[in-house]
């Protein structure tokens, strides 16, 4: 497999760059308001429990990533020109990957938690699960943080023929990957495909239990809706990006020559699908507010008033 050499990745994509900047501004504004609101409501209006712990961890991850979005807005506004130095690029990239895979893992934990709550209600005890939930949360952060921290120690910027500095992008096709394509595919399989399969199985079991009448409580129906919302968010936010990465890695493995225009298209596709991934920062707090709204009638009314 051969590469075509130096490549101007973004020739002709000026309008798309500005569109990405506008979309990211909207995501940043919405995410900041929603996540801070959800965090405040979470601390003051809901009792401790596994669901709260998972969702609070999601929100913390979203906030950490949201504060880096102004840098991404600047990058898009100046037509993919990074003006903030090497370390800022590393930190932004690090938090982006952390948010993606921490979110995927906690969304998977939530679905599994709901699976046991609905299909094994006699064995499920929220209080007994709190310690296990704490351990799961701690392990999730460690497992994601340790390998991703390598990003902080490698160069993440590069320059091209236009004398612009790119962040986490490469003007030479042959430099477009840190890892061999097959390793990237394996990582996508572990980080996305397996969690997606677990969520789909949990969702199917929950809905089967509820719709078959095995568990007829109102709470069970709400759980079915919750897991469906989480699965929908998962598909919208994370499936396009990982499908794009996997398909391109397969293209590299199977093709004798990778053309510049293919790489350019892939880079823009990554930016577009990454915008979809950023949407999870807005959707996570909405799901949290959805869950919190059922705790009591008074709390439900206060949450609804926020959105009038």
Swiss-Prot record:
Residues 42-52, 113-133, 202-226, 292-308 are cytoplasmic. It is found in: Host cell membrane. Residues 1-20, 74-91, 155-180, 248-270 are extracellular. GO terms for cellular component: host cell plasma membrane; membrane. SUPFAM superfamilies: Family A G protein-coupled receptor-like. Pfam families: 7tm_1. Belongs to the G-protein coupled receptor 1 family. This is G-protein coupled receptor homolog FPV206. It comes from Fowlpox virus (strain NVSL).
């Amino acid at each position: 497999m051969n590469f075509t050499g130096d490549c101007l990745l973004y020739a002709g994509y000026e309008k798309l760059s500005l569109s990405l900047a506008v979309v990211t501004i909207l995501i940043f504004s919405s995410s900041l308001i929603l996540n801070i609101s959800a965090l405040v409501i979470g601390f003051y209006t809901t009792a401790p429990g596994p669901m709260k712990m998972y969702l609070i961890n999601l929100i913390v991850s979203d906030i950490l990533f949201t504060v880096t979005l102004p840098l991404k807005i600047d990058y898009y506004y100046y037509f993919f020109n990074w003006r903030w130095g090497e370390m800022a690029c590393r930190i932004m990239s690090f938090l982006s990957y952390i948010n993606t895979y921490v979110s995927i893992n906690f969304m998977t934990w939530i679905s599994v938690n709901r699976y046991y709550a609905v299909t094994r209600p006699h064995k499920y005890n929220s209080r007994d699960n709190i310690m296990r939930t704490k351990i799961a949360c701690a392990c999730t952060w460690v497992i994601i943080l340790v390998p991703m921290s390598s990003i902080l120690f490698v160069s993440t910027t590069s320059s091209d023929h236009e004398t612009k500095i790119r962040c986490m992008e490469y003007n030479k096709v042959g430099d477009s990957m840190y890892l061999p394509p097959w390793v990237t595919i394996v990582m996508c399989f572990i980080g996305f495909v397996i969690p997606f399969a677990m969520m789909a199985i949990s969702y199917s079991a929950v809905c089967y239990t509820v719709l078959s009448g095995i568990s007829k409580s109102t709470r069970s129906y709400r759980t079915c809706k919750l897991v469906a919302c989480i699965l929908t968010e998962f598909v919208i936010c994370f499936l396009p990006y990982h499908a794009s990465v996997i398909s391109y890695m397969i293209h590299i493995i199977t093709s004798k020559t990778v053309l510049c225009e293919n790489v350019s298209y892939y880079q823009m596709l990554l930016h577009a699908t990454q915008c979809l991934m950023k949407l999870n920062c807005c959707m996570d707090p909405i799901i949290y507010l959805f869950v919190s709204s059922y705790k009591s009638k008074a709390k439900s009314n206060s949450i609804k008033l926020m959105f009038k």
